[in-house]
Amino acid sequence: MSAQRFEYKVVYADLRGRVSVEGDETLIEEGERMTAFGRRYLNSLGVQGWELAGIQHQPMGAAFHVFKRPLAEGQQPEPAKPIKTEPKP
């Protein structure tokens, strides 16, 4: 029997109501409370099997949230998205 393996997702969140994961942003809806926004976002990750594993606080109230979920035997983690760069003229 092999040891349990995990994949990880790093989520950046700030006090303006913005969540960013590898360039994909989710914004707070007009009139939505911050706590409701946080719960909505966390529940969407929970449905996908992600569990909060840690938080790294940043200046100005921002933070990196690290989530993990188990990998099935033989499954590989999702690859990270490449950084989009503009072609140089």
Locate each region found by the language model.
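Terminus-proximal functional modules
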Residues: 1-89
